[in-house]
């Protein structure tokens, strides 16, 4: 779209009415979506109506359809479930029900529907849209509406958002609620692990997901489970023997617990359900292990939404309004979905069709195809799970040895990356060393060989088990080279923040002086600041955002109770404003000051005036985030003094510096998984590179592509040579020159009720669901 069009969009909603409803099973993050749709709708000048109790409210009408204003959706982003209620509705499946629904919508002049729900709810919406014309004719015949009304409201437009914890909708990488459900599952697994270890027990955990094994698959990956049952990949006949053998094996190698994860829809090769009680009895009879079953049930739907779900829902909600405004009678009903970290629009019925194809493939026992149709993120998770589950200590040794170290500040997920890298390295036949305390430890010779079981139980641990330091290699080059020679190290895997990247760059630049540095090197970016070039997401930043978000939720609660209070919260991140921006969106902050988005005293004045105006409404609290290095003069103390004196008599002010609690406790499911995948992919890349550069009995690597940063860029995993990244880096402020998340700031400002230039808004493209988009090239 051209820039001019978007400026027009500012009032393009004028005269339009949008109805929002949540339907089917609830999911965490639905409230954030309702909030975003409502505010974006009001922002573009449309009238917005909240439809209570899903389709039931639509059919019954009356008090169930209420106009919304900006404040109707205040302070709901942190609540689980849906404040407008949801119901599974029989009446809407009949033509009479839909006729009543059409009549109720016309009473309010609503011809735009935003439906947040699962595939059933969205299919229902599409049927409704297709029948709209004939429903109006019928209403005219019955004399309920006039001919002119029917002409004015001749078309119904629909935008769908997929809200379902099962992540069973094809075409979107993540559905609203999935990440939060994984949070609940991991909290339970962490809690169960401690009791299982005390008693040497086996636990069989049953997770939800109907006919989709996504939750089971990802929680098995993120918890290092011993065995997994999912409907898309039933076990081979005779699996009972294999499973018991595997469980016995892990026990004999010193493990004190076994975890078996089973999806509620799990079946065997012949379509017969596998129940958790059957698995339990099997383990007890064959192995005599003390075994317990835990069925997680509706716990998974509950609790506060994770940061990912809040941001995903907010982004999708805004995009849904744009889709409604841009729709014409000829455009198909669309679903707003996520692909990588980009939002896209997909034709609703194409997605529903592929979702049905999965079920059909499973019914017809074409299981490989079912996994492929689930999409690339599912297929990739499955491949990595199989790889890790079937890995064994290699019988044949390769000639290669490599070292793994952590550099920079601790970040959640580092240990998960170390664990999977160590095990992948050992199963490739390499000798793997771990180095304590970063480059300094390498210089002092704190190097030890590591075995398969030395990294057991590391997945869910926060911080860095290897110990980490910020020291760069330059001052210790002689000693480092000496130790690389002593231990005959052919490759380095460096897991850490900006220092890890800068350190490897220094080693590469010293290759001319020291032949020992002509080895393969790979950096896995791991820092809460998300400031490493070569990747969109660093390991640990998801955990940090969630930690900061939980703190801000509590601070907001305190401000709500006190009335007329503004909190100024300082986040970490160095010069990089990622943490402040993303946390700001997740907690509905009024402003977030960051270094990348320069601001002056006029902006601060505007913010204070905006806050004063806000205090005249029913929302008498404010939350302002400030990145620690966003401005050398406008410090947290300065902002506190400014807000306090300008707001005297209207509001009072308090500050909070979050500090190191942002490094997080246990890693979030995203970071455990991301760490595990990066560890595997980096190690496989290192192995391949070592074979490429092995000549005449020695390793000699001096090409630029022998030292890379691995990262997720848009939709693919990419390896970027550190020498090429050098020109993309601002070394003075320790961050990349280009940052993708800056366009999220528009969303932050708009949702906080500021005028924004729509010229900068990037709307999602309409794509199609094809086998190609579902295939996995390099996806995650």
UniProtKB/Swiss-Prot annotation:
Entry cofactors: Mg(2+)
Binding positions for beta-D-fructose 2,6-bisphosphate per the UniProt entry: 470, 527-531, 565, 572-574, 628, 654, 660-663, 734
Post-translational modification: GlcNAcylation at Ser-529 by OGT decreases enzyme activity, leading to redirect glucose flux through the oxidative pentose phosphate pathway. Glycosylation is stimulated by both hypoxia and glucose deprivation.
Catalytic EC class: transferase
Segments for region (N-terminal catalytic PFK domain 1): 2-390
Catalytic site positions: 166 (proton acceptor)
Annotated spans, C-terminal regulatory PFK domain 2: 401-780
PANTHER family: ATP-DEPENDENT 6-PHOSPHOFRUCTOKINASE, LIVER TYPE, PHOSPHOFRUCTOKINASE
Name the record gives this protein: ATP-dependent 6-phosphofructokinase, liver type
Organism of origin: Mus musculus
């Amino acid at each position: 779209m051209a820039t001019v069009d978007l400026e027009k969009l500012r009032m393009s909603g004028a005269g339009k009415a949008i109805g929002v409803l949540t339907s089917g099973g609830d999911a965490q993050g639905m409230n954030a979506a309702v909030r975003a749709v409502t505010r974006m709708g009001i922002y573009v000048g449309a009238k917005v109506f909240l439809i209570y109790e899903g389709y039931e409210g639509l059919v019954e009408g009356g008090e169930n359809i209420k106009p919304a204003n900006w404040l109707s959706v205040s302070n709901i982003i942190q609540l689980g479930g849906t404040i407008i209620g949801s119901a599974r509705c029989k009446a809407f499946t009949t033509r009479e029900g839909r006729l009543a629904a059409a009549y109720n919508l016309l009473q309010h002049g609503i011809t735009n529907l935003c439906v947040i729900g699962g595939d059933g709810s969205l299919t229902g919406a599409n049927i409704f849209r297709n029948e709209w014309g004939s429903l109006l004719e019928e209403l005219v015949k019955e004399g309920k509406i006039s001919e002119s009304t029917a002409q004015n409201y001749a078309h119904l437009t629909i935008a769908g958002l997929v809200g379902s914890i099962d992540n069973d909708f094809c075409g979107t990488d993540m559905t609203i609620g999935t990440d939060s459900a994984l949070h609940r599952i991991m909290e339970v697994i962490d809690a169960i692990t401690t009791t299982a270890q005390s008693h040497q027990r086996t636990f069989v955990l049953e997770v939800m997901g109907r006919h989709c094994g996504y939750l089971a698959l990802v929680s098995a990956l993120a918890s290092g489970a011993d065995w997994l049952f999912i409907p898309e990949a039933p076990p081979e006949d005779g699996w009972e023997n294999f499973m018991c053998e595997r469980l016995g094996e892990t026990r004999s190698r010193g493990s004190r617990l076994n975890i078996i994860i089973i999806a509620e829809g799990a079946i065997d090769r012949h379509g017969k359900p596998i129940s958790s009680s059957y698995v339990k009895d099997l383990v007890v009879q064959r192995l005599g292990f003390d075994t317990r079953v835990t069925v997680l049930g509706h716990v998974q739907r509950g609790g506060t939404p994770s940061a990912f779900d809040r941001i995903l829902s907010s982004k999708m909600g805004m995009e849904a309004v744009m889709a409604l405004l841009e729709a014409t009678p000829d455009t198909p009903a669309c679903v707003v979905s996520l692909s990588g970290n980009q939002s896209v629009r997909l034709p609703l019925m194409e997605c529903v069709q592929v979702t049905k194809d999965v079920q059909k493939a499973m019914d017809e026992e074409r299981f490989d195809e079912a996994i492929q149709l689930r999409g690339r993120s599912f297929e990739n998770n499955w491949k990595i799970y199989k790889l890790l589950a079937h890995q064994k200590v290699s019988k044949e040794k390769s000639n290669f040895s490599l070292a793994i170290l952590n550099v920079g500040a601790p970040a959640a997920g580092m240990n998960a990356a170390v664990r999977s890298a160590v095990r992948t390295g050992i199963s490739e036949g390499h000798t793997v060393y771990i180095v304590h305390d970063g480059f300094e430890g390498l210089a002092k010779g704190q190097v030890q060989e590591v075995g398969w079981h030395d990294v057991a139980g590391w997945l869910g641990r926060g911080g860095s088990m290897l110990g980490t330091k910020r020291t760069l290699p330059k001052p210790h080059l002689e000693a480092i080279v000496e130790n690389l020679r002593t231990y005959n190290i052919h490759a380095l895997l460096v897991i850490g923040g900006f220092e890890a990247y800068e350190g490897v760059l220094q080693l590469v630049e010293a290759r001319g002086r020291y032949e020992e540095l002509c080895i393969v090197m790979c950096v896995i970016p791991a820092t809460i600041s998300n400031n490493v070039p070569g990747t969109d997401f660093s390991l640990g930043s998801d955990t940090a955002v969630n930690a900061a978000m939980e703190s801000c939720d509590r601070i907001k609660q305190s401000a709500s109770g006190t009335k007329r209070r503004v909190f100024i919260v300082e986040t970490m991140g160095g010069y990089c404003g990622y943490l402040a921006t993303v946390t700001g969106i997740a907690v509905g902050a009024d402003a977030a000051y960051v270094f990348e988005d320069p601001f002056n005293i006029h902006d601060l004045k505007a913010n204070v005036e905006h806050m004063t105006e806000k205090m005249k409404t029913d929302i008498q609290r404010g939350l302002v985030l400030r990145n620690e290095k966003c401005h050398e003069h406008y410090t947290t103390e300065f902002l506190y003094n400014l807000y306090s004196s300008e707001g005297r008599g209207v509001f009072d002010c308090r500050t909070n510096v979050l500090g190191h609690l942002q490094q997080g406790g246990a890693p979030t499911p995203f970071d455990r998984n991301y760490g595990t995948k990066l560890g595997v992919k980096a190690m496989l890349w290192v192995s391949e590179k070592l074979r490429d550069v092995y000549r005449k009995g020695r390793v000699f690597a001096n090409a630029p592509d022998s030292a890379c940063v691995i990262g997720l860029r848009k939709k693919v995993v990419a390896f970027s040579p550190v020498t090429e990244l050098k020109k993309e880096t601002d070394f003075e402020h320790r961050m990349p020159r280009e940052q993708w998340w800056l366009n999220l700031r528009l969303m932050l400002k708009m949702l906080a009720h500021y005028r924004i230039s729509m010229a900068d808004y990037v709307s999602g493209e309409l794509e199609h669901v094809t086998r190609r988009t579902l295939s996995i090239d390099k996806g995650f």
